């Protein structure tokens, strides 16, 4: 019965994205990493206050400081394995909860005001970006499956898109690992540098929110990229990003049809195509739109969302291994960077075409 496992047999079984259940033993396991993330968050918030006191304003927000401090701790101190579960918990689940809470500050009227033109424009941006990114990858001699993973990761929702697409196209574990490794690094770089485009390009808060929603990899990372700019940017960026994430289902269906379902022996479940926190976000937005959330508690909900986001950014920094850039390979790196630049240009073109002020 034993047989040699071929490379083509090493296919990725996508993880389920339902909200995980917590037990006492799991809580014990996450405490070291969670405590470290909270400590870095506290330090980041103190440094932000020091900035405000001596410089008159916070040039680096606590969100950004938390990422930088977390990355520095990971690079210099290298926390041991016992911190990993808590770091992963903080970087993923806490950030997803922050997204859910953010829904309480957004009304459905904002979606209606966005208009059908923007919604169809987002779908067009995703389609064009995937095509261009795949073309760039193939021109740089990336294998077909690797090019698809990078294209979908860049154009839709980063690691989630990569994990969902992998079983559909029969991707090997090495391809998935390389794609995810560099996407994690590039995602942090985008969060840190994208706000610089506001003064550089003279973008309004509305324009920047749409740009962030169209270019930042993950829904939670949109919070980190837009929070230093304005609340309006946060709200618009999140809405645009949610629409972009919902493109994952149709895109996976298209690739499954193209591949003739030969490799789709493991089909992504509902919660992989539509993560639980997006459903939670929409539910909170509906409650807010129906005036079922008391106005008096909205500031507390918004503060909790912001605080959880900072903790998650600290954990995100703790999970960044700069050496992953080298291990990802030069062609993957160049493909991802060129694809991101193309995505930014396409997004700015859409903003200009729609006449967004």
From Swiss-Prot:
Per UniProt, which keywords does this protein have? Answer: Cell membrane, Membrane, Transmembrane, Transmembrane helix
Q: Where in the cell is it found?
A: Cell membrane
What is a single cellular component term in the Gene Ontology annotation? plasma membrane
Q: Which domain of life is it from?
A: Bacteria
Membrane-topology annotation of the record? Multi-pass membrane protein
What residues form the membrane-spanning segments? 29-48, 58-77, 90-112, 117-136, 149-171, 181-203, 210-232, 242-261, 268-290, 300-322, 334-356
Return the similarity comment.
Belongs to the UPF0324 family.
The name under which this protein is listed is: UPF0324 membrane protein BMEI1914
What species is this protein from? Brucella melitensis biotype 1 (strain ATCC 23456 / CCUG 17765 / NCTC 10094 / 16M)
């Amino acid at each position: 019965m034993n047989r040699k496992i071929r490379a083509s047999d090493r296919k990725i079984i996508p993880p389920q994205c339902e909200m995980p259940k917590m037990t006492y033993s799991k809580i014990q396991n996450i405490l070291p990493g969670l405590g470290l993330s909270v400590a870095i968050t506290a330090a980041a918030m103190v440094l932000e206050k020091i900035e405000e006191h001596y410089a008159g304003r916070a040039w680096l927000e606590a969100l950004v400081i938390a990422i930088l401090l977390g990355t520095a701790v990971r690079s210099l101190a290298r926390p041991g394995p016992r911190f990993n579960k808590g770091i992963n918990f903080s970087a993923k689940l806490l950030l997803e909860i922050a997204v859910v809470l953010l829904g309480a500050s957004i009304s459905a009227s904002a979606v209606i005001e966005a208009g059908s033109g923007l919604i169809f424009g987002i779908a067009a941006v995703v389609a064009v970006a995937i095509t261009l990114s795949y073309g760039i990858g193939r021109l740089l001699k990336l294998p077909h499956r690797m090019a698809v993973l990078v294209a979908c990761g860049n154009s839709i929702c980063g690691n989630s898109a990569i994990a969902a697409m992998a079983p559909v196209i029969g991707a090997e574990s090495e391809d998935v690992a390389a794609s995810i490794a560099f996407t994690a690094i590039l995602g942090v770089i985008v969060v840190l540098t994208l706000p610089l485009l506001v003064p550089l390009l003279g973008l309004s808060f509305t324009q920047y929110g749409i740009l962030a929603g169209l270019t930042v990899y993950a829904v939670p990372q949109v919070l980190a990229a837009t929070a230093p700019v304005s609340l309006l940017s946060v709200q618009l960026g999140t809405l645009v990003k949610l629409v972009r994430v919902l493109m994952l289902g149709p895109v996976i269906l298209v690739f499954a049809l193209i591949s003739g379902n030969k490799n789709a022996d493991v089909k992504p479940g509902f919660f992989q195509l539509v993560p639980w926190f997006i459903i939670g976000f929409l539910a909170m937005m509906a409650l807010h739109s129906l005036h079922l959330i008391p106005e008096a508690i909205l500031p507390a909900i918004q503060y909790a969302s912001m605080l959880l986001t900072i903790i998650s950014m600290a954990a995100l920094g703790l999970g960044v291994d700069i050496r992953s850039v080298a291990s990802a390979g030069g062609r993957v790196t160049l493909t991802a960077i060129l694809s991101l630049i193309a995505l930014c240009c396409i997004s700015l073109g859409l903003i200009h075409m729609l006449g967004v002020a």
